[in-house]
Design a protein with these regions (language model features):
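Conserved AMP-binding/adenylate-forming
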Residues: 48-95, 214-215
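Conserved pre-ATP/AMP-binding loop-to-beta segment of ANL
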Residues: 15-18, 151-169, 175-176, 201-211
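Conserved structural elements of the adenylate-forming
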Residues: 39-47, 161, 180-204, 215, ...
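Conserved ATP/PPi-binding loop(s) of AMP-dependent carboxylate-activating enzymes
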Residues: 308, 328, 335-338, 346-370, ...
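Conserved AMP-binding A3 loop
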Residues: 32-35, 157, 165-192
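Conserved AMP-binding/adenylation subdomain of ANL enzymes
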Residues: 188-211, 218-256, 270-275
Length: 491
């Protein structure tokens, strides 16, 4: 099973259906792209990248990096590189040039794509231009225009199931990112399972077509996997980014939004003040929040608008999806996929299956520590209920260990703080031997009486807690708490 092979089967099935909604960056006009047209573009991009591959010395690996905002051309070149036998390496477009070049040197990236917004920064562009030989630093817009003029490659490279086709930086809230190698089999598992599950619905003509808007970054596994999953369902997507999202939100009557929780929170806040945004949200039936946990406040806000909140469980190391099946349940991450299995070992969630990464690039020690006896140890704490639903309860490395040997789970305390409707964001941590909490509240930032209500809530909460768990220091922030690139609160 290979990624390109699975996508070919999907495209052949839905050939005439709409696959993508695209916005022209110059005119702002929208256009519709069918599955067949999309795959023609991917095949043409594969021709372009095949020629680029031939231009490399034999001993140089064929890897293509990118630092750019989300867009349809980004995704086409993403697949075009893989279909030409290359390894795609998406990097966070907000990285400075120094950090981009640091990872490029560590991984070995002979070609680097860059977005127009990134190259508009003259200092950034100058640093990358100085580091790359002529013809190796490539503007994304120019590459897409050139690849569209190429003849489609008839024999796309499929490779072997264990071939590395994607390298991603592991996401986290602390420490240096590790480089994850995802294989053909890893990336194929989810879209293939979704596609096969829907075969009866396709044959009976009962398959509904949904229009989706996705804004999760393509440098993250949570950006690409939902796209191929929706394509497997025969649905269409508009790939948006933070710069264009509000404009794109009103482009169609989208039934599903695929976003980070922090982004969804901002949309709902805007809808409270803007009747037009509130009207746009009336067509939305479901919101899939990935990249970070949804707070109880956000879940309730979605319910209040008759929008179904959904979340899946997965990591970069598990190629995104571990759980996604079953009807929604508040607080749960659905049930496990058929292509993998999970177990709880000493409270830790462990995963084994086709979606588990090959390993960390040039880091056998970290790989051996993470994958033991075939099981990937996620570092997340959780439980599985009698119906197979997974609940994530915390992160092992976040556990606060006090000098008296007592263990305190910050996530458990954070859930208790979120019971206060005034709390929008919170992080619990240790300050010496005391438990502390940082809280952001929109209401409290504007009204001191609301801040006093939060303090009173925490005081009352402490009366119900063991002494070691009581929150001794409370900091109310007037600004949102710091987050990583996928919206996870930093600790």
């Amino acid at each position: 099973m290979t990624f390109v092979g699975v996508l070919e089967e999907i495209v052949a099935c839905y050939r005439e259906r709409e696959a993508f909604i695209c916005r022209d960056t110059a005119s702002g006009d929208l256009s519709s792209v069918s599955f067949e047209e999309f795959w023609t573009s991917v095949s043409s991009a594969a021709t372009y990248w095949t020629e680029k591959r031939k231009a490399l010395p034999q001993n140089e690996p064929f890897r293509v990096g990118i630092a750019a905002d989300n867009s349809y051309p980004y995704f086409v070149e993403y697949l075009g590189v893989i279909a030409a036998g290359g390894v795609f390496v998406p990097l966070n477009q907000s990285f400075g040039a120094e950090r981009v070049l640091e990872f490029a040197a560590e991984i070995g990236i002979p070609y680097m794509l860059a977005g127009a917004a990134q190259l508009a920064d003259s200092e950034y562009a100058a640093e990358l231009t100085a580091a790359y030989p002529p013809g190796r630093l490539l503007p994304l817009d120019e590459v897409f225009a050139a690849s569209e003029q190429c003849e489609p490659l008839k024999d796309l490279h499929k490779g072997e199931p264990d071939d590395t086709i994607l390298m991603l930086l592991s996401s986290g809230t602390s420490g240096r990112s590790k480089i994850v190698e995802n294989t053909n089999e890893n990336l194929s598992a989810y879209p293939n399972e979704v596609f096969e599950q829907l075969r009866p619905a396709r044959e009976s003509g009962e398959l509904h077509h949904y229009e989706n808007l996705i804004v999760l970054p393509l440098f993250h596994i949570g950006g690409v996997i939902p796209i191929v999953g929706e394509l497997a369902r025969g649905n269409s997507l508009l790939i948006s980014n933070a710069r264009q999202f509000l404009q794109d939100l009103g482009a169609r009557k989208f039934e599903k939004l695929i976003v980070a929780p922090a982004m969804m929170k901002r949309i709902l806040e805007r809808a409270e003040k803007n009747a037009k945004v509130a009207e746009i949200l009336e067509s939305v039936r479901e919101v899939l929040c990935l990249g970070a946990a949804m707070s109880p406040v956000l879940i309730q806000a979605l319910h209040d608008r008759d929008i179904l909140p959904r979340t899946y469980y997965g990591l970069t190391e598990t190629t995104g999806t571990v759980t996604y099946r079953g009807p929604y349940r508040d607080g749960a991450c659905c049930t496990v996929a058929d292509f993998c299995e999970i177990k709880i070992e000493d409270e830790e969630i462990c995963v084994r299956g086709k979606n588990v990464m090959k390993g960390y690039y040039k880091n056998p020690e970290a790989t051996a520590e993470a994958i033991r006896d075939g099981w990937f140890h996620t570092g997340d704490l959780g439980r599985i209920d009698e119906d197979g639903y997974l609940y994530v309860t915390g992160r092992r490395k976040n556990i606060i260990v006090l000098s008296n040997g007592e263990n305190v789970s910050p996530e458990v305390l954070e859930d208790k703080l979120y019971a206060c409707p005034l709390v929008d964001e919170c992080v619990v941590y240790a300050d010496g031997e005391e438990i502390a909490a940082n809280i952001f509240s929109v209401a409290a930032a504007a009204d001191e009486t609301k801040a006093e209500e939060i303090r009173a809530f925490v005081k009352q909460l402490n009366r119900t807690l063991p002494r070691v768990e009581q929150i001794q220091k409370l900091n109310l922030s007037a600004e949102e708490l710091p987050k990583n690139s996928t919206g996870k609160l930093l600790r």
